[in-house]
Design a protein with these regions (language model features):
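N-terminal Rossmann-like FAD-binding beta1-loop-alpha1 element of flavoenzymes
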Residues: 15-42, 401-405
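Short hydrophobic core segments
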Residues: 18-20, 142, 161-177, 240-243
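Glycine-rich FAD pyrophosphate-binding loop
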Residues: 34-58
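An anion/pyrophosphate-binding glycine-rich loop and adjacent beta-alpha core
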Residues: 47-49, 54-55, 63-70, 103, ...
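Glycine-rich active-site loop/strand segments that organize a redox cofactor
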Residues: 60-106
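Feature captures the FAD/FMN-dependent oxidoreductase FAD-binding
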Residues: 87-165
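A glycine-rich dinucleotide-binding beta-alpha-beta segment and adjacent secondary-structure elements
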Residues: 138, 305-383
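Glycine-rich loop(s) and the adjacent beta-strand/alpha-helix scaffold that form part
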Residues: 165-209
Length: 405
């Protein structure tokens, strides 16, 4: 039960569990801990909960993935996520979605989206919190956290609070306009945790090489379906999108999590076609056709013209030697470039790196440095692929902690 403790002469509101961060992980953990009968205070510095939920999935929230498994996550400690994901699976969250009569559908590749709006997921979480008596307080900034014997004391803009269990669910650094800060990392550092280097993940690439940038700018808004993008031995087959500043689209966002500055990426623009064989047969069947005419059957007319102009000499197919045709096939199947950088946290969907999971219990999410302190969600060094995996990590890690706080 909530009560009051006197500490150094001032009234301190006591809650057994305090959770900082009312995003996906924080809301889920609050609801589940409260369902166990724990009195929970959920704090956030923002004026509204779940802002990132509302803008996710183009406003429809890709809330999980049917094919979620540990292989879909990046971490310096890849085994860490296995326990939580096994104990609260994608189907457990789907059950919750069904319980609240939220209509949903699979878009593709196992990605589950709301039929209506992302607010259905936020409202579901808020309803669960409300049902179990979670005390949600917004517009509350945390000024200091102090370790007490058997708990923690928080000095906030809304007064003094103390707790037995303190859960940090403040997310990473991505999309600062939605309120992202490095608060969780500061808390971890304060209590002796190791922080692994952070960088933007699931983020578009920027291009500065003049000719390549001109190509991207000219083709801005053009999408090419089902390309295979490769970097450092990892590949993804998805769409790519040309932008004014470089390259984006699902395949690019996915590979960005495996890219380091200076690395080259390779793009197969036509993985579904045996290009050498196709070009040879076209040369035989249509010797007078120009290369750009041929390319216009595979890409938009504008893209075909630009590629023919910048990459190749467009001439009738009969004038190409076998070696020249081979070079055309090679370029289309292995377009290699070195991005100048990424768009950074401003547009990144996630933050790579974070709190070293080797210092956190994979069963309970509790700190091994400071008993009673828990970390869940994106603040940890666990990053999912694009497609609902990061939400599933939020639900699973929140559920894990909620059973023990």
């Amino acid at each position: 039960m909530r009560g009051f403790a006197t500490h150094r002469g001032s009234a301190v509101s006591f809650f057994p569990v305090i959770i900082i961060g009312a995003g996906a992980a924080g809301l889920m953990c609050a609801a589940q801990a409260a369902a166990r009968g724990r009195q929970v205070l959920l704090l956030d510095h923002a004026n509204k909960p779940g802002k990132k939920i509302l803008m996710s999935g183009g406003g429809r929230c890709n809330f999980t993935n049917m094919y979620c498994e540990p292989a879909n996550f990046l971490s310096h400690n890849p085994h860490f996520c296995k326990s939580a994901l096994a104990r609260y699976s994608q189907w457990d969250f789907v059950e919750l979605v069904v319980k609240h009569d939220v209509p949903y559908h699979e878009k593709k590749l196992g990605q589950l989206f709301c039929d209506r709006k992302a607010s259905d997921i936020l409202n579901l979480l808020l309803a669960e919190c409300d049902e179990h008596g979670v005390d949600l307080r917004l517009d509350t900034s945390i000024e200091t956290i102090t370790k007490l014997e058997g708990g923690y004391r928080l000095h906030t803009s809304a007064g003094e609070f103390s707790c037995e269990s303190l859960v940090i669910a403040t997310g990473g650094l991505s999309i600062p306009t939605l309120g992202a800060t490095g608060f969780g990392y500061q808390v971890a550092k304060q209590f002796g945790h190791t922080l692994l280097p952070t960088r933007a993940g699931l983020v578009p690439f920027t291009i500065t090489e003049p000719q390549l940038k001109a190509l991207c700018t000219e083709l801005s808004g053009t999408s090419v379906e089902d390309c295979v993008v490769n970097c450092n031995g990892v590949s993804f087959k998805e769409n790519i999108l040309f932008t004014h500043r470089g390259l984006s689209g699902p395949a690019i966002l996915q590979i960005s999590s495996y890219w380091q500055p200076g690395d080259a990426i390779s793009i197969n623009l036509l993985p579904h076609i045996d290009l050498p064989a196709w070009l040879a047969s076209q040369q035989q069947d249509r010797p007078n056709s120009e290369l750009k005419t041929l390319l216009a059957e595979l890409f938009t007319k504008k893209m075909a013209g630009l590629l023919a102009e910048q990459w190749f000499v467009s001439k009738p197919l009969k004038q190409y030697t076998p070696a020249e045709l081979e070079a055309v096939a090679q370029k289309l199947a292995e377009w290699t470039l070195v991005p100048a950088g990424t768009e950074g946290y401003r547009t990144a969907e996630v933050t790579l790196g974070g709190i070293d999971t080797r210092e956190v219990s994979s069963k309970t999410m509790e700190s091994q440095k400071s008993p009673g302190l828990y970390f869940i969600g994106e603040v940890l060094d666990v990053t999912g692929h694009l497609g609902g995996f990061n939400f599933q990590w939020a639900w699973a890690s929140a559920h894990a902690a909620a059973q023990f706080v």
